[in-house]
Design a protein with these regions (language model features):
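A short, structured loop/turn motif at beta-sheet edges
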Residues: 1, 24-32, 60-64
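Short connector loops at helix/strand junctions that flank enzyme active sites
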Residues: 1, 51-53
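Short aromatic-glycine-(Arg/Gly/Cys) micro-motifs in beta-strand/loop hairpins
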Residues: 1-16
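Short loop/turn motifs at secondary-structure junctions and domain boundaries
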Residues: 14, 47-50
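A short, exposed loop/beta-hairpin motif centered on an aromatic-Gly-Thr core
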Residues: 16-24
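Charged, amphipathic alpha-helical segments
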Residues: 30-44
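C-terminal structural segments of small proteins and small subunits
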Residues: 53-82
Length: 82
């Protein structure tokens, strides 16, 4: 199992994960990141504002980014027909 650190970032600010979390595979890591981003977006929806400026960067113990998910890529929006 490898330890990864999930950092929440936008172009200005960042919220760093000092503890990290262990994952058995990259697939498990990707699923966790997707679930987490969607959970954060669900909270945004409940508050009436969706903020797509953010992303989660997963870094390994050496500090290399191994996976990034921008919030805007975590869901699909189906617009109302005109």
């Amino acid at each position: 199992m490898a330890r990864y650190f999930m950092h929440l970032r936008d172009s200005i600010d960042e919220l760093l994960d000092p503890e990290g979390q262990e994952f058995a595979s990259m697939e498990e890591l990707r699923k966790w990141v997707m679930f987490t981003v969607r959970d954060l977006l669900a909270a945004d929806i409940r508050n009436g504002l969706i903020d797509f400026r953010y992303r989660i960067d997963a870094e390994d113990e050496a500090g290399a980014i191994v996976y990034t998910l921008a919030f805007k890529h975590a869901l699909s929006i189906i617009p109302e027909p005109i």
